[in-house]
């Protein structure tokens, strides 16, 4: 068995799918840890080519020998909710100003997409998490 590499950093970023480039914020975040930025950009863009237009969070593990691995996460719940509700952004005051609405079926669909990244045991618990996010954005959930 090969010896384990020592981890020197864990970097979490949210990047547009297929549009990673060395410009800020990506360049400085990776460059400060000695990672080859273009290698990461090419690998990330290749893996996210089919998800164009979405923001895909990525968790980059940088090792002491300056090599790296990365794990793609599911798109943020807020982004999925905005897309489902057809709104540009959430509200500043969710108590008084509602910006859109989604159905329970749409919430279930989003929860199924997000399930691997949520800390929920089952789909109903995942739906409650997504409904809470919708409420805080000023999006109402209808039956």
From Swiss-Prot:
Assembly and binders: Part of the ribosomal stalk of the 50S ribosomal subunit. Interacts with L10 and the large rRNA to form the base of the stalk. L10 forms an elongated spine to which L12 dimers bind in a sequential fashion forming a multimeric L10(L12)X complex.
Mod. after translation: One or more lysine residues are methylated.
Its biological purpose: Forms part of the ribosomal stalk which helps the ribosome interact with GTP-bound translation factors.
Molecular function in Gene Ontology: large ribosomal subunit rRNA binding; structural constituent of ribosome
Keyword Signal: no
SMART domains named in the record: RL11 (SM00649)
Biological process according to GO: translation
Domain of life, source organism: Bacteria
Name recorded for this polypeptide: Large ribosomal subunit protein uL11
Pfam family, one: Ribosomal_L11
Family according to the record: Belongs to the universal ribosomal protein uL11 family.
Entry's Gene Ontology cellular component terms: cytosolic large ribosomal subunit
HAMAP family registered for this protein in UniProt: Ribosomal_uL11 (MF_00736)
InterPro entries attached to this UniProt entry: Ribosomal_uL11, Ribosomal_uL11_bac-typ, Ribosomal_uL11_C, Ribosomal_uL11_C_sf, Ribosomal_uL11_CS, Ribosomal_uL11_N, Ribosomal_uL11_N_sf
Keywords for the protein's UniProt record, in alphabetical order: Methylation, Ribonucleoprotein, Ribosomal protein, RNA-binding, rRNA-binding
